[in-house]
């Protein structure tokens, strides 16, 4: 009976664990795992194919080859189960025990484990406090180490060469002991008293003053504490016993032709055994020291390469000169155990085929080829056949299916009814890459896909393939049906917009049907209802675009009753729109359809329908839109021809003008007014503008056509040109593409990204000449090459993002925090890039939102803001709202629903169990891949935004300058801006900010503070191609360090022969002048240096590298005059190529090179004494303390003497360093910086991602903190720990009435954050597997299986979605059972005590009793 139960025991034991612990195995442990010692290197007998006894495949040790059969064949069958054969020693049992039984090798000499030796930092080195170099010399028998100095002056752990040893041995004899090899190291490790050492280190840490020492001690202390806590003995890092992997995991497979394919591990084990046996023999024979020593070294090397081949020295190679694959390689990397087998399992019940379009399907259906369905649903069919009595056995059922009996098809129909299948298209970049559909059986061999889900799958029908998976269990079917059915996933999780938006021909059909034409057939007719309109249209009385009057039935929703009420209204509309009104869902007014339906409009329509009419109505509506679109596109019969590409008449003039302008620039260049770089920039600018003008002229011409009205007068109407309609509707093509067809191709980029200054003036209709064609090929090829490279990059970014966020799940409803982030509309360059409504939609209000006019509470804190609410907020002109954000959520080890807000893929508050981390990672990673794949569509045509050179007001209002704005008035009365962060605001009558414009240094202001202006007024102008250096004082120029040949060079232009002075790069100067900085001082009439007002400092104006000096020594200058110009670099085209690495850089939190410097404190700036190469900047804070900063001289300082700066303000020009922002300005500022920067990259490509996804990633980057002061908590100062863990520990400490630890935030890049997670399983499966496992083993780490990844790896349900509920229920049950058990024990104890007491009462009457009542 027990044996029968053994069959089932496997299943029960794997579900019931809550954590996995990793540690070092002691020799005793290894022996206890083993079923016997492997003594011989033989594998199997090559004649009989039976394993050799005591060899690497020995059946006695590892178990039988065949189920229930011993090796010699004496015992066969189940009845002998458990017998051990007396002849061959094999236990009669299942052959699969060969997958789990381990052996061992007793090593003749101890060997060090290479991971703990070589994995940096070397753990052995840290425990022994020796260098890796020294330990290696000892281990590989190059030196002796003193293990016991005895009474001699030698020190413990001292290293000696052989000659030293011989000399010392002469001197001291046996008074000391020194060893070579792992024995010596083992003795040292055994002698360590960890508790004492740790105590001493703690003392040292307290007393030590030097930074370096503190760092060193803390590191060693950490390792020692790890050993202390885990109870692992350090000498276990040296192995005396080597475990042998079960043979089925390193198989030997016979190939045809008598050869064998073997796993590399067998070779590696063979070497170890051979060397070990040879060493044993040598030791028995008492061979000379030098020989055994060599053999020991070889044994150490053999064990090294078995564990991690190639880690030290040359890798061991097999017969074919290929390095052997060691145990370490089996688990790491893309093909290793983790990523290949545990996270990348293959699935049965699946198939794949080419996809074709299925326009007749409903949204929740897919067409499944009959043969495929038959194969996939085989077990279900067998079951049905047996139930119906058509087959008695499975074998008979199989036969029926194989010959495809007609009854089988009926059963198949029955089986697949309401059994959803999952379709997946690789690459699965976001959760919409796998969706469930109900299968419809079809003939043929291709899967039919619904056209509307193509956008979500990013599928097209040019040969794409898709995979089908069958959910088997009832639970799986239910989840597929409720959570994954395509009709339940109609919104993108990344931005909450509909994913089932019609595209291409559907859009074209709907657009064509909803356009209106002047004087079309039957114009002005009146109809009583829509059916009459349809009749008239079918009888060719009217056209689709005819303008008519018709009565239309609508069903608006009654607010009070919630019912739909029928109303009939007269509308002036077109025939097509009236016909379309038939499919409008109840609750939407006709006015939403009464316009030309472009792609954006249709998207809005579906979104509106979803919000107002619910999911079901929307799905039906989308399907009907699809049908109508296809039908109407077919009826429209739109086609394009060469004559549709109208080349604009103005093209010749525009190009002629541009050419003359270019000539003018060339002349200016040859007369030396502009430099070569400026000339190039200006030429590119002129041609860019010319291209745009041609494009504009072409679109203007395409857009309209002449028509005659009914009364015979001429007028124009929007064009019915086929190409224009396709682009305008959003069906296919864009203005940029039409521009290349009919305008001019424009500027092209070279492969390196720089723009070729001669444009292609021809277009595709006119045709390109050979040179133009050749220039074009650059762009086309670059596109293809980029795609391949960038897809890989984007995939890697997604992988890192998923890894850092995979354990973030919504685990509770509300964490109760009142923190949040203040949201404002995002305004840049005076334009509202993202309105406030879009930023707060779907968030939860953190404070009450108050009506600014009545001061009444509009929405209470904790309200989820929906579309109507944000409309209202915007209407009232509220310009700042504080909302909850994942960044400030107080939930430990997860998030709460209130801080996250709306689940964008569902449109409601997020559910507990939603894996918001993974959704965020996918939302950011998915467009990355899309964009990278999309670069080459414009054909490399340089799309470069024309550089802005002025700024205008967009609205009426009052001008306000910000506090940071500073300007001077020059001799001509112009106001020149001299601050670098100045901004001009326009405010409305209520004083609310309407727009804000950054004004660059050196710009000329046209308006004054407080001026009332109209929209369109210019505010400021500047030269976009150079940055000026301006004087704020009047005086005579006196150059300092401006020496030709050393700090400046005279550039003589080849063409013009004119010269200018250019400051040269310090790197190109001689050593003497490297550190000096060319600058200007000003002298007054008396010849004294002009001082900065109110200080003793002389005015000094430094020149940056590359500056062109425009003044001469001794020249008189006035306020606001330009002293030098710095040309901006020639523009390169930016697409997401610049973008993807930028996103990666932000998420990796890399400090940019040449980062700008932020003020550490609030205070007043002064310049101190300059040192060589650096200038000294002092900030005196409010308490009068001075803070010094040294700044290299080539940097641009943004502040001046006497200026007051705020903490965190830029003082030295350059890109911001996220670490500085976090340190000086806090979490919110950092999050805003990262969110805005990432959004900039995506916005440039027109991709919408909700801010909260980026915030979720930032939360994960900030999840670790550094201990500043440990208090009474169990930490070391400077240690980095998980925030949630530290807060838990602090709670514990506070509860005991002790001092909690204080900490500061740490910003980690996503790779670092992934590797530093608490879960070693997750970290090991990500990157640097060996390092992670080594560290975890020493610390005896316990993985609580909190994240998704760890659970996937150990094969449990993930703790998200339905799995979260499952695990919670299981834990509750466990704790309930534990309580029950405790209660039972308690009652038993009480009963026992009562019994004992009764006994005691009996016994106490007898005087000499010594019974203990226990």
Swiss-Prot record:
Residues reported to bind Mg(2+): 460, 462, 464
Gene Ontology molecular function terms on file: DNA binding; DNA-directed RNA polymerase activity; magnesium ion binding; zinc ion binding
Class in the EC hierarchy, top level: transferase
Cofactor: Mg(2+); Zn(2+)
Listed GO CC annotations: DNA-directed RNA polymerase complex
Region (Disordered): 1395-1414
Catalytic activity field: RNA(n) + a ribonucleoside 5'-triphosphate = RNA(n+1) + diphosphate
Ligand binding (Zn(2+) 1): 70, 72, 85, 88
Entry EC number(s): 2.7.7.6
InterPro entries: DNA-dir_RpoC_beta_prime, DNA-dir_RpoC_beta_prime_bact, RNA_pol_asu, RNA_pol_N, RNA_pol_Rpb1_1, RNA_pol_Rpb1_3, RNA_pol_Rpb1_3_sf, RNA_pol_Rpb1_4
Transferase listed as a keyword: yes
SMART domains: RPOLA_N
Positions with a binding annotation for Zn(2+) 2: 815, 889, 896, 899
Cofactor note: Binds 1 Mg(2+) ion per subunit.
Keywords assigned: DNA-directed RNA polymerase, Magnesium, Metal-binding, Nucleotidyltransferase, Transcription, Transferase, Zinc
GO biological process: DNA-templated transcription
Function of the protein: DNA-dependent RNA polymerase catalyzes the transcription of DNA into RNA using the four ribonucleoside triphosphates as substrates.
Quaternary data: The RNAP catalytic core consists of 2 alpha, 1 beta, 1 beta' and 1 omega subunit. When a sigma factor is associated with the core the holoenzyme is formed, which can initiate transcription.
Cross-referenced NCBIfam families: rpoC_TIGR (TIGR02386)
Protein name: DNA-directed RNA polymerase subunit beta'
Origin species: Janthinobacterium sp. (strain Marseille)
Native organism taxonomy: Bacteria, Pseudomonadati, Pseudomonadota, Betaproteobacteria, Burkholderiales
Gene: rpoC
């Amino acid at each position: 009976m027990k044996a029968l139960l053994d069959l089932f025991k496997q299943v029960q034991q794997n579900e019931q664990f809550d954590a996995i612990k990793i540690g070092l195995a002691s020799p005793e442990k290894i022996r206890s795992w083993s079923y016997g010692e492997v003594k011989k290197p033989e594998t199997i007998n090559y004649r009989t194919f039976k394993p050799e006894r005591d060899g690497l495949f020995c059946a006695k040790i590892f178990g039988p080859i065949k189920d229930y059969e011993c090796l010699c064949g004496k015992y066969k069958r189940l009845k002998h189960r458990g017998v051990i054969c007396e002849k061959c020693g094999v236990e009669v049992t299942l052959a699969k025990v060969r997958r789990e039984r381990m052996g061992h090798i007793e090593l003749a000499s101890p060997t060090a484990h290479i991971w703990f030796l070589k994995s940096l930092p070397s753990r052995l080195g840290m425990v022994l406090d020796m260098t890796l170099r020294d330990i290696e010399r000892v281990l590989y028998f190059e030196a002796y180490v003193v293990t016991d100095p005895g009474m001699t002056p030698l020190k413990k752990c001292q290293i000696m060469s052989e000659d030293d040893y011989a000399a010392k041995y002469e001197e001291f004899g046996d008074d000391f002991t020194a060893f070579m090899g792992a024995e010596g190291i083992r003795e040292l490790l055994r002698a360590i008293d960890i508790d004492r050492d740790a105590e001493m280190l703690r003392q040292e840490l307290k007393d030590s003053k030097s930074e370096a020492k503190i760092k060193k001690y803390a590191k060693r202390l950490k390792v020692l504490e790890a050993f202390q806590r885990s109870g692992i003995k350090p000498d276990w890092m040296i192995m005396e016993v080597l475990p042998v992997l079960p043979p089925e995991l390193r198989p030997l497979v016979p190939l045809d032709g008598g050869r064998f394919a073997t796993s590399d591990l067998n070779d590696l084990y063979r070497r170890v055994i051979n060397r070990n046996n040879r060493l044993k023999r040598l030791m028995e024979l008492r061979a000379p020291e030098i020989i055994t020593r060599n053999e020991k070294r070889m044994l150490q090397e053999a064990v090294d390469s078995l564990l991690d081949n190639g880690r030290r020295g040359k890798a061991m190679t097999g017969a074919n000169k290929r390095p052997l694959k060691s145990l370490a390689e089996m688990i790491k990397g893309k093909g290793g155990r983790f990523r290949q087998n545990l996270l990348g399992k293959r699935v049965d019940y699946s198939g794949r085929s080419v996809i074709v379009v299925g326009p007749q399907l409903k949204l929740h259906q897919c067409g499944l080829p009959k043969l495929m369905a038959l194969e996939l649903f085989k077990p279900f069919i067998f079951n049905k056949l047996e139930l119906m009595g058509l087959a008695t056995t499975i074998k008979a059922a199989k036969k029926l299916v194989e010959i495809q009996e007609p009854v089988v098809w009926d059963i198949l129909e029955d089986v697949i009814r309401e059994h959803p299948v999952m379709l997946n298209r690789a690459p699965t970049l976001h959760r919409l890459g796998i969706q469930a559909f109900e299968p419809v059986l079809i003939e043929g061999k291709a899967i039919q896909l619904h056209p509307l889900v193509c956008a979500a799958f990013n599928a097209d029908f040019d040969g794409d393939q898709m995979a089908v998976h069958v959910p088997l269990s009832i639970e799986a079917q239910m989840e597929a049906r409720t959570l994954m059915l395509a009709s339940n996933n109609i919104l993108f999780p990344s931005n909450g917009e509909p994913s089932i938006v019609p595209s291409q021909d559907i859009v074209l059909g709907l657009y064509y049907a909803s356009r209106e034409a002047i004087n079309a057939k039957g114009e002005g007719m009146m109809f009583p209802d829509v059916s009459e309109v349809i009749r008239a249209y079918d009888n060719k009385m009217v056209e689709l675009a005819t303008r008519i009057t018709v009565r239309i039935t609508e069903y608006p929703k009654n607010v009070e009753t919630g019912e739909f009420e029928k109303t009939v209204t007269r509308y002036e509309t077109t025939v097509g729109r009236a016909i379309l009104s038939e499919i409008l869902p109840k609750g939407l007014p006709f006015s939403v359809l009464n316009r030309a339906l472009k792609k954006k409009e249709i998207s809005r329509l579906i979104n509106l329908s979803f919000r107002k009419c619910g999911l079901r109505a929307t799905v039906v509506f989308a399907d009907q839109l699809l049908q109508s679109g296809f039908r109407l596109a077919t009826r429209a019969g739109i086609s394009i021809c060469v004559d549709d590409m109208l080349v604009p008449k103005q093209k010749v003039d525009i190009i002629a003008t541009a050419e003359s302008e270019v000539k003018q620039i060339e002349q200016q260049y040859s007369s030396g007014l502009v430099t070569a770089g400026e000339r190039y920039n200006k030429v590119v600018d002129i041609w860019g503008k010319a291209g745009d003008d041609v494009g504009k002229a072409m679109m203007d011409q395409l857009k309209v056509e002449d028509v005659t009205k009914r009364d015979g007068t001429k007028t124009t109407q929007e064009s019915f040109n086929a190409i224009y309609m396709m682009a305008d509707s959003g069906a296919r093509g864009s203005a940029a593409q039409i521009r290349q067809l009919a305008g001019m191709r424009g500027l092209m980029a070279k492969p390196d990204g720089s723009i070729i200054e001669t444009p292609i003036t021809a277009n595709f209709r006119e045709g390109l000449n050979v040179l133009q064609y050749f220039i074009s090929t650059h762009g086309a090829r670059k596109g293809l090459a980029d795609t391949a490279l960038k897809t890989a990059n984007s995939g890697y970014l997604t992988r890192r993002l998923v890894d850092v966020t995979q354990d973030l799940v919504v685990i509770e409803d509300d964490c109760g925090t009142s923190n949040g982030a203040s949201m404002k509309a995002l305004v840049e360059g005076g334009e509202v890039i993202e309105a406030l409504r879009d930023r707060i939609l779907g968030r939860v209000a953190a404070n009450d939102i108050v009506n600014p006019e009545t001061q009444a509470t509009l929405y209470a804190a904790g309200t989820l803001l929906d579309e109507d609410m944000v409309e209202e907020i915007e209407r009232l002109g509220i310009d700042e709202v504080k909302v909850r954000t994942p960044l400030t959520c107080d939930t430990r080890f997860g998030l709460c629903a209130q801080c996250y807000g709306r689940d964008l893929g569902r449109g409601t508050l997020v559910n507990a169990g939603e894996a918001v981390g993974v959704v965020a990672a996918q939302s950011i990673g998915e467009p990355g891949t899309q964009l990278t794949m999309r670069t080459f569509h414009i054909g490399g045509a340089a799309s470069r935004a024309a550089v802005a050179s002025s700024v205008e007001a967009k609205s009426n209002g009052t001008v306000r300058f910000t506090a940071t704005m500073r300007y001077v008035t020059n001799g001509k009365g112009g106001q020149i801006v001299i601050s670098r962060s100045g901004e001009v605001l326009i405010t409305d009558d209520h004083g609310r900010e309407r727009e804000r414009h950054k004004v660059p240094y050196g710009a000329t202001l046209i308006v004054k503070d407080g001026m009332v202006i109209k929209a369109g007024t210019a505010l400021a102008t500047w030269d976009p191609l150079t940055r000026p250096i301006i004087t704020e004082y009047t005086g005579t120029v006196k150059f300092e360090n401006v020496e030709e040949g050393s700090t400046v060079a005279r550039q003589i232009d080849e063409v013009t022969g004119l010269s200018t002075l250019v400051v040269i790069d310090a790197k190109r100067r001689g050593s003497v002048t490297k550190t000096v900085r060319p600058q200007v001082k000003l002298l007054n009439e008396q010849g004294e240096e002009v001082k900065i007002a109110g200080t003793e400092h002389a005015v000094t104006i430094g020149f940056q590298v590359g500056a062109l000096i425009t003044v001469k020594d001794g020249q008189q200058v006035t306020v606001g005059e330009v002293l030098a110009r710095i040309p901006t670099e020639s523009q390169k085209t930016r697409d997401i190529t610049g973008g993807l690495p930028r996103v990666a850089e932000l998420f990796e939190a890399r400090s940019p090179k040449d980062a700008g410097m932020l003020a550490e404190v609030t205070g007043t700036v002064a310049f101190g004494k300059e040192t060589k190469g650096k200038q000294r900047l002092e900030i005196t804070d409010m308490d009068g303390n001075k803070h010094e900063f040294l700044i290299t001289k080539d940097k641009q300082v943004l502040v001046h003497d006497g200026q007051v700066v705020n903490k965190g303000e830029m003082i030295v020009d350059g890109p911001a360093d996220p670490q500085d922002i976090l340190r000086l300005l806090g979490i919110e500022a950092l999050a805003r910086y990262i969110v805005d920067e990432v959004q900039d990259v995506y916005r440039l490509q027109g991709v919408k991602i909700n801010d909260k996804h980026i915030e979720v990633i930032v939360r994960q980057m900030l999840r670790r903190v550094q201990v500043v002061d440990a208090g009474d908590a169990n930490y070391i100062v400077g240690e980095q720990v998980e925030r949630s863990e530290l807060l838990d520990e602090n709670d514990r400490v506070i509860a005991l009435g002790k001092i909690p630890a204080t900490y500061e935030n740490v910003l980690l890049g996503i790779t670092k954050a992934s590797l530093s997670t608490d879960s070693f399983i997750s970290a090991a499966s990500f990157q640097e597997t060996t390092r992670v496992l080594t560290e975890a083993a020493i610390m005896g780490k316990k993985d609580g299986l909190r994240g998704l990844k760890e659970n996937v790896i150990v094969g449990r349900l993930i703790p998200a979605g339905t799995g979260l509920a499952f695990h919670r229920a299981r834990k509750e049950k466990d704790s309930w059972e534990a309580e029950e058990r405790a209660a039972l024990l308690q009652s038993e104890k009480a009963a026992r005590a009562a019994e004992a007491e009764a006994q005691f009462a009996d016994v106490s009457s007898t005087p000499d009793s010594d019974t203990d009542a226990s």
